[in-house]
Amino acid sequence: MSDALKKSIVDAIEEGQLKLGYREETIRLYYPLSSLCTLMHQSMDAAQMTRALTTFSEQVKGELGEIEVSRKGERFCLAVGPKGAAWVHEHTDPSGFLADFIAAIGHHGCTMDELLAIFRRHGGRVHVEALHNGEFDWLVYFEDGKPDAYCYCIADEGCHLTYHRFTKEDYEAFGFETT
């Protein structure tokens, strides 16, 4: 089983539940083949990945329930059923870093200083880097990967901040230039 893929699924569902609230419903997550290969720690073509994901879904069925796998070309959809949504809701921390981060960035007028204070409150060494790539203004992450190992790309939209978070591997694959 791919622990990295399971973690990615759980983290994405948790993020959605923190933003939108919990509902016991099917959640669809979309992944490009390249990201799945990274999470599965091996290179595969789309047909091989479909088979690997079918096996993976059987392995995590006890926790995440049924996961329906579909694809169009090299874009995969993992439809995690209501049982999986409930399991994530019951097994994640509603008061941790991500909850604090999402609550802050969801408020109109949130500042970068407020977000950095949250990062620093939840982790030791925080990497902060100005970006000039036309897409994002800052790259922020926990250098030791705790409490999470995602790269947070933050953009100042004038009246509010927005973000996307990526695995380090996906972020590096984008090839964004930094200062």
Model regions: which residues?
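Charge-enriched amphipathic alpha-helical scaffolds
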Residues: 27, 37-66
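Short secondary-structure junctions
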Residues: 20, 62-69, 120-131, 178
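A cross-family detector of function-defining hotspots
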Residues: 111, 117-152
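Long, charged/polar, surface-exposed segments that mediate recognition or autoinhibition
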Residues: 95-119
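Charged low-complexity interaction tracts in eukaryotic proteins
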Residues: 58-94, 134, 138, 160
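Positively charged, polyanion-binding regions of nucleic-acid-associated proteins
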Residues: 1-29
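Short glycine-rich, basic-tinged beta-strand/loop micro-motifs
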Residues: 23-43, 98-104
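Intrinsically disordered, low-complexity regulatory segments enriched in Ser/Thr/Pro
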Residues: 146-177
